[in-house]
């Protein structure tokens, strides 16, 4: 059969009681299961008796024993009912070749026998047994049957030769120990085979025996042997030798007589007799012959003996065996089959048996389906209260029984057809018609159906149904969702116990709890770099986690992924075998406990809960799907799941806190909930083929000598029930190419990996597979490099827990790009360079003898001649198209560089090419913070690239995909240039020029170049528009509070927002610059009021403007009572202040610590400037020359925000309102403690209405932020820098600096106070006051006014020359500066490519600007 098909029978439920018990034993928890039958009712179906039974013997025994299945039991029941279980033996032994012989296979189940046999057991124990047989066997068998005896401890059994005692024959003895776990025992013969073969030779099993009553002497027969096998926990015994090859030995028929008063009566045997059989003596000549039905023997208990008890009880067992063998129908077995778990001997020899000459057949069996008013399935022992339910269950559980029951009446009325089997022997007294050959449908996995004689040929073809895995195993059930739609939803708020934040509804609270866990993982409190964020499984290494994410949680659909337990498998046959062994048809283990909605997929239940049960009081645990109604209980339960001691279900992705919950979940939910619709109404026995995909299945030849053809149509062999390990998917062609490449490289001697700089002792282990990082664009085939990448970039802790796995590169060996002049000694840097420059095809190794002259920081140029020589030595056309992974050899000669150029694994080369493990395309520190340059590196010119340093060397971005398309290669900025531009956008151009030692004009030119190419779309998944708006709002809020917005804080916040909203994303310098420009986040924009704010911020700004103007109109507030207040915090670095060369950087207006002093500015809408209050942290007397417009408050410990507002209100505002005697309005931001109850009460006491500016809106609607505040800060910066240059060699303390700041404040406030129109227009630009016509000005009009105000005030303060970077550069008068670099770019880029001009390069053009 095809390797992707599995033949399965339409069965609604296959969960046997022994499967439940094995689950419990696996979890080391013993529980009482009420589903297991604990009564002693035994339902027995006998099979045809075809052994040569003498007439006299049959006449004497028929009244007591009319079946070949004997159950020994007593009335005394053991009180320990928890260990009773079901033992099922299914032997479909039709008239064909039986599993054991046609003489009848007795099943001897002993349980506390009668006093005549003595006490031999004390308690029952669980022992399941199954016996199966194929359908296509021959019609007759020459060997008699053997009994099956099940006990709990080994006992001596005399293997007496038939000449001594013919009644001492034991069939199959299943010997187990109390408390021992024994899984199902399956005995499966091959077609045309039998387990008991005629043979010669008798080994001695034991030597002592308690005497028992002898039976009649039997005629001499050939010697027989025993078949001894040790049964492990799970055993499958297959008979493979065809019957035609077995040695047949004829024997003489035997006769024996048995007294009428035999032991079976005293044993309390249960004999089930078929209809038509008489309890009186029956003449075999008159007995009709019918086709033999399949025989199913079912018993409820197995006898148990305590392990420590030996001696006398063992003899009693032997007495019972010998006594039972005195019965003729049980004593005709030619040889015993002993199966013991205490014996180490194994053997399989043939025995001889008598030929059958006379058959006593029975009619259709009668199944005892009643048990105390309940209906019981004869196969799985499932209980039903209604007969119709049992009938429907049996149609799928045991259809062959139903089929034969339907045919019973017609078979009873019709005589049987004589068989063409062997003719009767001359010794037979009377011939009897034998059973015709008929092949019923077996109970499990029917291959084909042979038509019966009375069936039409058209109906003989077996129906076949082909189903996909999704249709057969997966499904969903709506539960009570329809009933819940009628009830109204009432949102319930929840308060987080960690941060006391109140969430609006249950879904927000659930997401908030997950956010706390993610924060713990980022802070390093929880080691989360090996935990899957999708299914919450723990992996041993980040590499295994990455492979799991790619195989299971990738967006690509896979035909080898189990959607129930969320595991991936290497091939479809393994996947199908897993589904057959682990899951049931229509299994839906994920259940919503609120409405009983269930599904086979976890994601469907999760989405269902978030959609249907939103705005309710229910809280869903994502780990075990438990529902809570209390927030504290949910939080405690949620945090307990973060611990290690959880119990994972091996059949799905759920994990539980207690083993009891796990066991209950497996018993209740891992079974068929609802059979697939395709199986409804099918004919019993329909063959169902399961396929993993719709495509044609592949055929794989099976090279097995001992496997019969029919075995290919059976189900695949059983596998372990343990959790499957993730399998790394890889195309077979690529796997073979990789193996060949690894073998070729292994013979090249000692190798060193250029990516991690470690030696490669074992190529398969060092390059196991090609993996991609799910958090960024990093890809590699080096396991050590991948681990290092995860540790360095995706483990969010301040101090790394693990050291990097890189070694220092070997000096003297460098990598050179064959398409440009880029040279480095770090393989990772070269990989980055090749990734971001697709047109650069490969790299080469420069041996130790060659040197590379790089452009130094002193202006030396590169050796262009050497560059051309290298290109001639390794011409680009000789390299493959894709980038290569280069491996350097320690044995390479200095004159001949050794290189192995390999294309990427997904893009396979020609068959003749040799492939090595895939290369390492990387992304520059995506998600993690880009490395900050050191002090020395920041002082370097950006264009001076130190090729040997991995810190300063960065590749050039190529977003276009080619150097000659659309925007030329020169239009793209390198990562280092983008970093400088980002610094200028976060701070300003002047600070960027000072920080990186680059001219401001060059930085502004880079910015213009980048804006010219801004229309290109970035490839890959970056932050969405919603996430970018959240980030833009954060930037605006940070600047309002004078908190730093730089490269580090920006990337940290972007990472946090991206993970919380999107999961996976990318961050780069190019994206960061585009983000700052797209949202107009430059700190000194002159037209900020016209810029578009984020959506939520813009809505809040509109509401604020409407509120303010409405209150001014309704309250008729005068302009003299409308005040705007804001604080300016000044930060002083005393260490920098005490230095000689960095004093100008000591005073800053951005910081995170306690401010050195706070300046409170206040202006009125009529153009008046209120006195400015300065709060100084320290002791200082009032300066004598302090301006009248400034008030000073000094205290050693400083002032809190509430104290600042209280002092300002007392010393400034209340004095002003006392003169006005009118209501007022105070415009202030929402930061600090402006919204505290103390501040609001203070304002209410002075009849002042607070107008609070929403967060992120100050740059547009705060009158002080429009023009005055930024100008004051720039003026203080300018004055301090001038003062720092003058006092470079003199000491300066904070008191002296404060006096200077007070003087400068007085100067700037004097200028502003002399321009009341400027102050009043600030309120108009901020839309606090309406325009002259009573309407709000347009954004363009306000932006023009803002630009005019800034220019006018800077001109009066003489700041225009220092801060004119946003305006158009003025023409220079110097002849040396009249040549613009842009003109040269336009000249060379106008009609041709810049690469065709060898006289100028990017660095040369940049140097002309200095």
Curated annotation (Swiss-Prot):
Residues 1340-1360 form a coiled coil. GO terms for biological process: cell division; double-strand break repair via homologous recombination; kinetochore assembly; mitotic sister chromatid cohesion; positive regulation of transcription by RNA polymerase II. This is Pogo transposable element with ZNF domain. Residues 1117-1323 form the DDE-1 domain. Residues 239-266, 892-915 have a biased composition (Low complexity). Residues 238-291, 332-361, 409-456, 693-715, 857-927, 942-969, 1360-1400 are annotated as: Disordered. Phosphorylation increases its interaction with PSIP1. Residues 860-870 have a biased composition (Basic and acidic residues). Residues 267-284, 345-361, 701-710 have a biased composition (Polar residues). Residues 1015-1085 form the HTH CENPB-type domain. A motif (Integrase domain-binding motif (IBM)) lies at residues 1380-1404. It comes from the Eukaryota. GO terms for molecular function: DNA binding; zinc ion binding. The modification Phosphothreonine is found at residues 439, 463, 1368, 1378, 1394. Residues 810-850 are annotated as: Required for interaction with CBX5.
